[in-house]
Amino acid sequence: MTVSIQMAGNLWKVHVKAGDQIEKGQEVAILESMKMEIPIVADRSGIVKEVKKKEGDFVNEGDVLLELSNSTQ
């Protein structure tokens, strides 16, 4: 299970780390695109197994941000 990026831009802030429990609808990161801050929201619940991108990375639509385990949805 993964949480992916919805649009291209710079990954400005990541709010979670490996081992964190996240809930569906929780803001997990902020993307900066076209001088706007766009929240990245988890579309499922689970435990963060791995954060695949780091702050400052340029990301594309569809890139995997988080790998999750023990998803409850």
UniProtKB/Swiss-Prot annotation:
Keyword rRNA-binding: no
Domain Biotinyl-binding: 2-69
N6-biotinyllysine: modified positions: K35
Keyword annotations of the record: Biotin, Lipoyl
Outcome following mutation: Q21H: In strain: ATCC 6633
Induction: Detected in log-phase B.subtilis cells (at protein level).
Post-translational modification: Can be both biotinylated and lipoylated on Lys-35 upon overexpression in E.coli depending on the growth medium; the nature of the modification in situ in B.subtilis is unknown.
One Pfam family this sequence matches: Biotin_lipoyl
Residues found modified as N6-lipoyllysine: K35
InterPro entries membership: Biotin_Carboxyl_Carrier/Decarb, Biotin_lipoyl, Single_hybrid_motif
PANTHER family: OXALOACETATE DECARBOXYLASE ALPHA CHAIN
This protein's name: Biotin/lipoyl attachment protein
